[in-house]
């Protein structure tokens, strides 16, 4: 598929999942054409409903590799698809505002909506998590959930080599602390551009 169609597919997905509003359409499309280094954009009518953005992101990543924007490694793909999704993410203040409004009405619904947003933004990589093998076993202390984690791919030797070249830094302080919101990441630190915290 043409990259223009993939951009339109992602914008359609983001609107359906309420990551962006109608008013954000051109702002987000312009951010996407910048990240994907394409000069043109033409709005298209898209009629599809997807559970996650993974199929769209896969096409965009393949495009980025063909264009020489990234190398074909797991880490480069993860860094780049997070950068792509950041183009359709609400700002942290908007996420907090929505959460607080929802929480005032129904705390569980607020948490559920935040979780759905985390899946829609690909922060929670549901397509990978669904590959995990999970079962329950009864113990004297109650049921125990056992998971074989297949969602974390093996590191590519090229990614390991790049990580060795990254200058050591104390910023951000940890993988989940506040200063990660919007952090682009690098070979030694995952991208956190879609990371949102509720204080």
Residue ranges of predicted features:
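Active-site microenvironments that recognize anionic phosphate/pyrophosphate groups
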Residues: 1-198
């Amino acid at each position: 598929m043409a990259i223009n169609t993939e951009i339109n597919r992602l914008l359609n997905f983001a609107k359906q999942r309420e990551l962006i509003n109608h008013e954000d359409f051109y702002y987000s499309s312009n951010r996407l054409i910048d990240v994907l280094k394409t000069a043109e954009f033409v709005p298209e009518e898209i009629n599809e409903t997807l559970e996650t953005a993974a199929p769209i992101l896969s096409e965009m990543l393949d495009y980025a590799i063909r264009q020489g924007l990234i190398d074909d490694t797991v880490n480069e793909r993860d860094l780049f698809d997070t950068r792509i999704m950041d183009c359709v993410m609400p700002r942290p203040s908007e996420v907090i505002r929505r959460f607080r409004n929802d929480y005032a009405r129904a705390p569980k619904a607020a948490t559920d909506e935040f979780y759905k947003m985390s899946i829609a933004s690909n922060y929670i990589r549901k397509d990978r998590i669904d590959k995990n093998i999970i079962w329950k076993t009864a113990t004297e202390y109650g049921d125990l959930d056992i998971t074989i984690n297949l969602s974390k791919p093996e590191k590519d030797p090229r990614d390991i080599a790049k990580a060795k070249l990254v200058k050591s830094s104390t910023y951000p302080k940890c993988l989940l602390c506040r200063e990660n919101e919007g952090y682009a990441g690098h070979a030694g630190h995952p991208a956190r551009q879609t990371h949102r915290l509720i204080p």
